[in-house]
Amino acid sequence: MGVTELGKLIGKDIRREVKLENLAGKCIALDAYNSLYQFLASIRQPDGTPLMDRVGRITSHLSGLFYRTINLMEAGIKPVYVFDGKPPEFKLAEIEERRKVKEKAMEEVLKAIKEGRKEDVAKYMKRAVFLTSDMVEDAKKLLTYMGVPWVQAPSEGEAQAAHMAKRGHCWAVGSQDYDSLLFGSPRLVRNLAVSPRRKIGEEVIELSPEIIELDAVLKSLRLKNREQLIDLAILLGTDYNPDGVPGVGPQKALKLVWEFGGLEKMLETVLRGVYFPVDPLEIKKFFLNPPVTDEYSTDIKKPDEQKLIDFLVREHDFSEDRVLKAVERLKRAQTKYKISSLDSFF
């Protein structure tokens, strides 16, 4: 879900639109779960249901991951996918709430299928998308066969991705969410894992990658440091307190940060007595010091062609002709990189 309300304060003047080719030579730490959910929500059959193999296993995420990653590499981008680990304890209640929402949406999907309402199938299916552990493992397997690096985060994927960007091992974090800025990434690139065209109502709009720099956000919002940005996000709502503070919208939240300087003083004064399901200072502490690891590789390796074909074509019923052509594209794209045959860690 991410900090969507915060995005309303980030104006067009801060969002620098670029073409994929403008990111050539850059290493991008991609939020794997965010990307996979995008693929699951957008890659569907004409009846609104996801792509599936002959035994009914969902493959929309594999299709999106395979072809979109090749597109990124053809543009000269070096992708590194970062997978979520164990969430903080105070996120578990929100995760359970999301699970219930997805279950309810799936009930509506089944009802719409039974009644032949194709538009409703597509609508509710987007709300019902979920990732199983098997789907995640298949995504990791696919990336390994492609020779594309992936990292297992100890906790939040965006925290790990931001850590890699802060260390200079990746140029930016790639995600639709803004959380990586709170975790300290110097820059965020949005719209990398989505289709360049998106239908909103009857209108089809073009989506270009956009770069958002942390320093530019702080300057535009007249914030002294990242801590104040975190305070602002907590007032508006994060993954850990999605409702934020009742009655506090983007502009009011910004004024509170300007006036009181920080969350600590607000809790002693204007927010005294306000109920928080999760201690906001614990949330702030987590954004400032999340669990991360230095054990990771960003090396591109040679693809294992046979395993790729066996996995996608034999196991998951992808078109052999399309996969063979895509593998050739992948091999050509990889000539842009220094290929490693051994693991190398920072």
Curated annotation (Swiss-Prot):
The cofactor required is: Mg(2+)
This entry's comment on the bound cofactor is:
Binds 2 magnesium ions per subunit. They probably participate in the reaction catalyzed by the enzyme. May bind an additional third magnesium ion after substrate binding.
What class does this enzyme belong to in the EC scheme?
hydrolase
Which Gene Ontology BP annotations are present? DNA repair; DNA replication, removal of RNA primer
- Look up the EC number in the record and give it: 3.1.-.-
Region N-domain: list its residue ranges. 1-102
- Report the leader peptide range: none
Q: Which residues bind Mg(2+) 2?
A: 177, 179, 239
List residues binding Mg(2+) 1: 31, 84, 156, 158
**Listed SMART domains:** HhH2 (SM00279), XPGI (SM00484), XPGN (SM00485)
Where does the record place the region I-domain?
120-261
Alphabetized UniProt keyword annotations: DNA damage, DNA repair, DNA replication, Endonuclease, Exonuclease, Hydrolase, Magnesium, Metal-binding, Nuclease
A Gene Ontology MF term for this entry? 5'-flap endonuclease activity
UniProt xrefs under Gene3D superfamilies: 5' to 3' exonuclease, C-terminal subdomain (1.10.150.20), 5'-nuclease (3.40.50.1010)
A Pfam family matched by this chain, by name?
A: XPG_I
Q: Which PANTHER family match?
A: FLAP ENDONUCLEASE 1, FLAP ENDONUCLEASE FAMILY MEMBER
| Record-stated family | Belongs to the XPG/RAD2 endonuclease family. FEN1 subfamily.
As for what it does, the entry says:
Structure-specific nuclease with 5'-flap endonuclease and 5'-3' exonuclease activities involved in DNA replication and repair. During DNA replication, cleaves the 5'-overhanging flap structure that is generated by displacement synthesis when DNA polymerase encounters the 5'-end of a downstream Okazaki fragment. Binds the unpaired 3'-DNA end and kinks the DNA to facilitate 5' cleavage specificity. Cleaves one nucleotide into the double-stranded DNA from the junction in flap DNA, leaving a nick for ligation. Also involved in the base excision repair (BER) pathway.
Which proteins does it associate with, and in what oligomeric form?
Answer: Interacts with PCNA. PCNA stimulates the nuclease activity without altering cleavage specificity.
The molecule here is called Flap endonuclease 1
* Organism field: Pyrobaculum islandicum (strain DSM 4184 / JCM 9189 / GEO3)
What is the name of the gene encoding this protein?
Answer: fen
